[in-house]
Amino acid sequence: MEKIIVRGGKRLNGTVRVEGAKNAVLPIIAAALLASDGKNVLSEVPVLSDVYTINEVLRHLNAEVVFENNQVTIDASKELNIEAPFEYVRKMRASVQVMGPLLARNGRARIALPGGCAIGSRPIDQHLKGFEAMGAKVQVGNGFVEAYVEGELKGAKIYLDFPSVGATENIMSAATLAKGTTILENAAKEPEIVDLANFLNAMGAKVRGAGTGTIRIEGVDKLYGANHSIIPDRIEAGTFMVAAAITGGDILIENAVPEHLRSITAKMEEMGVKIIEENEGVRVIGPDKLKAVDIKTMPHPGFPTDMQSQMMALLLQADGTSMITETVFENRFMHVEEFRRMNADIKIEGRSVIMNGPNSLQGAEVGATDLRAAAALILAGLVSEGYTRVTELKHLDRGYVDFHKKLAALGATIERVNEKVEEVKEQEVSDLHA
């Protein structure tokens, strides 16, 4: 088992470049199945375990996939298999994103019920509701969900009960090859939705309105391979914004898109953090003293749930009482107990977490409970006394490329070690980046 060991006390300074967006690339790779003619070439693809997983799903479905030098080339022109098995889907719930493309291409899709981070129930009922509205029949049982259509999918007017990102992406992809026009209302507005729509349109689809609450998809007969560059990862950018703020540092985050970070920027400026938009990206300068604020997670353009745990780490250092309310996912406070192990004054009240600060955090051995919690615990370790050891790094590797190396390059005392060499002396660890 691997661990990240971090020693607190260093101000982080320098420049870091964010990767292509994990939450954009996964549905885009899945949507590449829609192209029955030609190859799709995707650039700015992050080297993440989730990307390898979705690539394996596509290979199982009989697509040819090559991943090298941050570029994925996909040829899905052969006849596709219809089933994504549990061995892949259990690792990552984004595997369910192949369902819409398979249904549109083959008229049938059979997907194991999804896995991924253990964040509440995260049902896929909105995905299935959309498929049914387009004429598909859906059956759920024996650990699988199966959808099939006699003939072809038909355009429909679909209203989502909640602006689900995954459902918006899956329905939008399926509708590209449906007969007629699909109007998707109360659609998710995230930048990743816009990126997927741009890719679909590059393949020959007719998608309009992505990024608004109403998306209109006019079905076409066929889609073709295309070239597409993945947008930068706004959550990775936000995570490094917190790294600068929490350590009182000064970091230029290259490749960050300011327009994608408005809600994060607003809250951090409210806390006293200085944020400067530059040509290369976003520069973040941490203050000597952070102010307490309240945050409520919301669908875009509200504050992103994927930044909740990182902001929690930051608010533990703020002067006064802060509250975070989680409205998007249930059961996304499992990291609170790990913060308590670090001597944090923090408690859960319903769907909210209340923090009193600033906290003098103590290094401890803590376990990552999900992807973003892994990053948050490392961020907390940057300002803790002594050594923090973070385990369950499989979560971290799903969403961050070389996170510890990027932090080390900014001045953090941090190393990733295998348990076999865990007996390394603390002094040796502290000297790693002296």
UniProtKB/Swiss-Prot annotation:
Residue numbers of 2-(S-cysteinyl)pyruvic acid O-phosphothioketal PTMs: C117
Regions annotated as coiled coil: none
The protein's role, per its UniProt record: Cell wall formation. Adds enolpyruvyl to UDP-N-acetylglucosamine.
Biochemical pathway: Cell wall biogenesis; peptidoglycan biosynthesis
Positions that bind phosphoenolpyruvate: K22, N23
Protein name (record): UDP-N-acetylglucosamine 1-carboxyvinyltransferase 1
InterPro entries per the UniProt record, alphabetical: Enolpyruvate_Tfrase_dom, Enolpyruvate_Tfrase_sf, MurA_subfamily, RNA3'P_cycl/enolpyr_Trfase_a/b, UDP_GlcNAc_COvinyl_MurA
GN (gene name): murA1
